[in-house]
A protein has these predicted regions:
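Residue-level detector of Asp-centered blade-edge/turn motifs that repeat once per structural unit
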Residues: 31-32, 97-98, 147-148, 195-196, ...
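Non-catalytic accessory segments flanking enzyme active sites
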Residues: 37-40, 46-48, 62-70, 75, ...
Length: 612
């Protein structure tokens, strides 16, 4: 990825237009085709590289992380990329379509905490080198220039305590003032795209539903002040959940990624911008799904004990029998600044329709702290870790029991990251409510987590709102390890060995305490090379099968002793590829082939990864 090539729209030979000494992480092409802006890390100094080649491979934690810089490349081929001197580490850049300006997102350092919490949008005048900080108020999402180059739209947080970027703001380039479009309401913006100089489309979420909307933006020609001339939009009454969007300014058509309860993400075409517009599906990535029978999926509303209205997505068991109670798998999303939509929710870490086909229900609650219900709702869990937010999960289970669907003695809980934290809490503090737990990359000790996570500022600003040393009791009481004596839930713990976000020691701590107490079965599975979530197909398949196996064993099967450690993946073993290995032949006095060995095979892709 150290070279950039272009190929004509009608095909032909590729042509190299840029190269760099480190990986090119992103680029933007000037509208007139004369220049490229590149994102790449700083090259390693020659003397440092020489020392590394000598074996000096020490890391200076956080200090020696390379900054991502912006480089400019002329398309005429004259010379290599030139460094654009800017303060900070860059992560996103967009050429202004009409002016010699560049919008760049800059963080104070290359660290992930600064990237998440403190990225600011800068408009750089390439003629003078002056960079103007727009000072967006919170977390930063997508950026997009209007086609006339006079407005810059962005998805941002309402302030530094807003847990997730989801507010739509527009900056005028004349006075660098914001037009706040979405601060008052409950909708959460997912993406944005301009179809003309003044029309901005944006899909997003309102609870479990999806919506698609556009604004017609006005701008005073003298003062540059922005306003809203017209709006159109409504929640989607169909089954599609809208995601990323892109626009063609020539005909104002849109391409948008959508998923539904019966298919994973596909590309749709939206023709025109008026009510009753054309809307049709363009791709079909998994045609075999049309032959599958799907269980009923629906939105369930319920109230928490304190009266707060909540909702979640329920997948009923396939071929459900009236009056019969079923096992339930409670899926808890991470964040908690995220949410479940009523679309495709069967993934490698979420059993969904797979569980339904095995005679189990699945419930996906949007507990307090979730996005899609307004900034105020998403902040309700702050300063109250493992408090009412996790009580909401129990209230959801109780509601399903009262509905007559769920057997309260056969409820399992699972989730990753913050959902893993909820699983650890459910398997200790609320252990009397759960017959099985599968915890993934989750927190177990808020005290030690505070010193090992790479997002300390985010944990402070949008979660706890207090530092460890300011309230030790709060952090201790909200830690699952504080409640291990209550453990009765068979717990499967899984974690990536290279997780920088929630250190694997969080799983090791909980495992060791539960193992020593020996009050219920516990197993720990570590994935080498994986971080905060599994990326490799083999790791995902292993996780998916272990999750399903654990839930079936303890919710439907005999329970008791843990299921077998080894997994049957249900895939044929490939023919072994034999390679020669070399050894010293004493008789011949030379290196020669002394044995053959079989190289392991890694599977490529699996059904459990669809839609992830």
């Amino acid at each position: 990825t150290r070279c950039l090539y272009i190929i004509g729209a009608k095909g032909g030979e590729r042509r190299k237009v840029a190269s760099h000494t480190t990986d090119i992480q992103g680029y933007s092409w000037k509208a007139d085709g004369t220049r490229l802006a590149l994102l790449a890390t700083e090259p390693v100094a020659k003397d440092k590289k020489a020392r590394q080649d000598q074996g000096f491979s020490q890391e200076i934690y956080e200090e020696d992380a390379p900054f991502v810089r912006v480089y400019l490349q002329h398309m005429d081929g004259g010379g290599g990329p030139e460094l654009l001197k800017l303060e900070g580490s860059a992560s996103e850049l967009h050429f202004n379509p009409k002016e010699n300006k560049l919008a760049v997102a800059l963080a104070p350092s290359p660290g992930i905490d600064d990237h998440i919490m403190f990225r600011k949008v800068h408009i750089v005048d390439l003629a003078t080198g002056k960079a103007t900080n727009l000072n967006n108020p919170g977390k930063l999402g997508q950026l997009a220039w209007s086609p006339d180059g006079k407005k810059l739209a962005m998805i941002t947080g309402a302030d530094k305590h807003d847990p997730k970027e989801g507010r739509l703001w527009i900056a005028g380039t004349q006075d660098q003032t914001f037009l706040k479009l979405y601060t008052p309401n409950k909708r959460h913006v997912e993406s944005l795209a301009w179809t003309s100089p003044n029309v901005l489309w944006h899909p997003g979420s309102e609870g479990t539903r999806s919506f698609l909307e556009w604004f017609q933006v006005s701008q005073d020609p003298k003062t540059g002040k922005l306003g809203i001339a017209e709006t159109w939009g409504q929640p989607n009454n169909g089954t599609e959940v809208f995601g990323h969007i892109s626009a063609a300014t020539v005909n104002e058509n849109l391409a948008i990624v959508c998923h539904t309860p019966t298919h994973a993400s596909e590309v749709y075409l939206v023709e025109g911008r008026v009510d009753g517009r054309g809307f049709r599906r363009l791709t079909n990535s998994n045609p075999w799904l049309k032959d599958m029978k799907f269980a009923k999926q629906e939105v369930v509303k319920y109230k928490a004990k304190d009266g707060l209205e909540l909702e979640g997505v329920l997948i009923r068991p396939l071929n459900e029998e009236k009056g019969k109670r079923y096992p339930l798998v409670l899926h808890v999303h991470g964040g908690p600044e995220s949410h479940y939509s009523n679309g495709w929710i069967t993934r490698y870490a979420d059993l969904g329709q797979v569980a339904a086909a095995r005679g189990m229900a699945s419930f996906y609650p949007n507990y307090r702290g979730s996005t899609g219900y307004g900034v105020e709702f998403s902040m309700k869990g702050q300063k109250d870790a493992a408090g009412k937010e996790f009580d909401d999960l129990i209230d959801g289970v109780d509601h399903l029991v009262k509905m007559g669907l769920v057997d309260e003695k056969k409820v399992g809980i699972t989730g990753g990251s913050y959902g893993g934290y909820a699983t650890a809490w459910g398997s200790t503090y609320y252990s009397h409510r759960f017959a099985a737990g599968v915890m993934f990359v989750g927190l177990s000790n808020l005290v030690s987590c505070a010193g090992t996570t790479d997002i300390a500022q985010e944990m402070f600003l949008v979660h706890h709102r207090k530092w460890l040393w300011e309230d030790w009791d709060y952090h201790i009481k909200a830690s699952p390890v504080k409640h291990v004596e209550k453990h009765k839930t068979p717990l499967l713990i899984l974690h990536g060995k290279n997780d920088p976000r929630v250190h694997p020691s969080q799983s090791l701590e909980l495992y060791r305490h539960l193992k020593v107490r020996n009050q219920a079965p516990v197993r720990l599975v570590l994935y080498p090379g994986e971080g905060h979530g599994n990326r490799r197909a083999a790791s995902r398949l292993d996780y998916n099968i272990r999750l399903l196996q654990w839930m079936e064993h303890y919710l439907k099967g005999p329970g008791g002793k843990m299921p077998a450690m080894d997994i049957d993946y249900g895939i044929p073993a490939p023919a072994a590829k034999k390679t020669a290995s070399l050894g010293w032949d004493d008789r011949r006095g030379e290196l020669s082939r002394v044995s053959d060995r079989a190289e392991p095979w890694l599977g490529r892709g699996c059904p459990c990864c669809i839609g992830w």
